[in-house]
Amino acid sequence: MKNILLIIFLIPLLINCQTEKAVSKYPSHVGNVEFDEKLDDPNFKRCGENKYAYQYYHASESGIPFKGEKLDIIRKLEKENIASTKSVNGYITVRFVINCEGKTGIFRMQEMDENYIEEELDKKLSDQLFTFTKNLKGWIPTEIEGKKIDYYQHLTYKIENGKVSEILP
């Protein structure tokens, strides 16, 4: 009788044991962007043992961590004279990782209209702003507790009547 009771108690335990490892479809951290060999530069290297990067708000207490700050980015953009022939309004955000050496990679772009609804504004304009952002040199590496880190940064271009009217943040 003891053996029968033991078997009755052990069967549910054995049935509920997992033999497979559950794999999450979600990134290890909210907002984490995984490397995509189809989109990303294979020469871009992340630093440290972590596969994730800190969010942009960890990087700088005083604005954009760029040599010459946001004003220098604005000046560079004005020299490029990037504009659309269409009268479009909205936002183009380019998000990327800055590694511990100040190099950039893993770029992603999102476009939305002035009501924050995802929409392609103007392919030529968005391609120009994407390339402009990728070519920016002068990102400042940052540290947390004396350790150099990788971090996300983003630039959002506010578009009014086909022209960049503001760079956020």
Tell me what each language-model feature is:
Residues 4-14:
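Sec-dependent N-terminal signal peptides
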